[in-house]
Amino acid sequence: KFDFASGEVTNDDNDWDIAFRGTSILVNGGSATGLAEEPARSGQGAAAIADGTFASVVSTGALTFSQDSASGPAIIPGSGNGWYNYAGAPTYLISPIPGKILVIRTRDGALAKLEILSYYKDAPSMPNAFSDQSQYYTFNYLYNPNKNSSSLE
């Protein structure tokens, strides 16, 4: 779990904004999706995916936010659906999709945007799904603590 306000990984049951479960990213808002060992939600978090570069996504604009639900996570999982592509044989790599920026409304109504850079430990420049540890997210993010703002600058 990650808390944007502190910029830290957290084990707190309430003070988290996003959680990682394999390639799925959960928000602290909505309801359980049915994934194994997912955290309880206590906030009003939601997510949207914007197309563009990290620098060019500057406002929530016309984005439509969704919360996690029994139908699935707000950030739709699966290769090509949300933030990543899965290569399959022979490399079996998980690679972030360029130009997909996740926009998060935090549990308390603030905003954040994040760009996932790597799914592998230490963000290797040439990842190897067989030798590099997976499920170690590396990302850039910007946090806007102003709850009445749509700015992502």
Provide a role label for each language-model segment.
Residues 1-100, 122-126, 132-153:
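N-terminal "domain-start" segment
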Residues 108, 118-120, 143:
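A mature extracytoplasmic/lumenal domain signature
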